[in-house]
Amino acid sequence: STVCAVLEEMSARSVTIISRKGEDNYNNLDRHADAEVIVNTTPVGMYPNCGVSPVDLSLFPKLEGVLDIVYNPARTAFVLQAEKLGIPYMSGLYMLVAQAKRTAEVFENRDIPDSETERIWKKLSLEMQNIVLVGMPGSGKSTVAARLAEKLDRIALDSDAEIEEKNGMSCAQLIEKHGEAEFRELESEAIAALGKRSGAVIATGGGCVTREENYDLLHQNGIILFIDRPVDALAVGGGRPLSSSMDALRQMEAQRR
């Protein structure tokens, strides 16, 4: 394959192909615990089936880098684990752009400088990346999202609005009727859908940070920004049953930081 050829050209000491049924397979990965580079050439983790990884990178303590040929989402579960483990990584978008450059050179019979690959990759990465806003209830996430979207010519999305549209009642009503735990499940479902989008500004509910799984859902295609406002400047009440008083907000802020 292309990946094997490139690795051999780069003087890799050895290249092992893992398959489902071959001699080297997913049931005996421990044979290769000394692997220094892993390249995912499968579609595992690709949109719309995000959130799954072909291997657990923690099984490879000597890893120095990983590459995923998948480019949507920008950060697959495979890449997100590498990021958490501090392992250098690259997703498939750069490879896609490089392939397009070479195709254009062949069809147009001209040379295109390598700097164009870098320029287009950076441009596409920025355009496709979501801007995700998190913060305390009443910190202005929805307002800031709308203004950012207008300024940057992007679509503004809101996880609370998504929940309300899907369930036919307000977030406050859902919490009062079903309790906070069930509401958080609905919130994660909404975030899972929004996190697969690209090029949007996403405002999240104040409590989305209480569930660790939401981080990966939002970060797979986005940069996460925290709107940090003093507790005394936050809006109290306003249809938010969990932040009905300043004392409740202060306690919430202490728990969520």
Model-predicted segments: where are they?
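Adenosine-phosphate binding glycine-rich loop
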Residues: V70-Q129
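NAD(P)-binding Rossmann-fold cofactor-contacting core
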Residues: E9-Y26, D160-N167
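Conserved lysine of the Walker
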Residues: K141
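ATP-dependent small-molecule kinase phosphotransfer cores
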Residues: D158-H219, R250
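A glycine- and Lys/Arg-enriched "phosphate-lid" helix/loop adjacent to the NTP-binding pocket
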Residues: Q220-R257
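Rossmann-like adenosine-cofactor binding region
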Residues: G22-Y89, C208-Y215
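Hydrophobic anchor at the beta1->P-loop junction of P-loop NTPases
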Residues: L133
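P-loop (Walker A) phosphate-binding loop of NTP-binding proteins
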Residues: M136
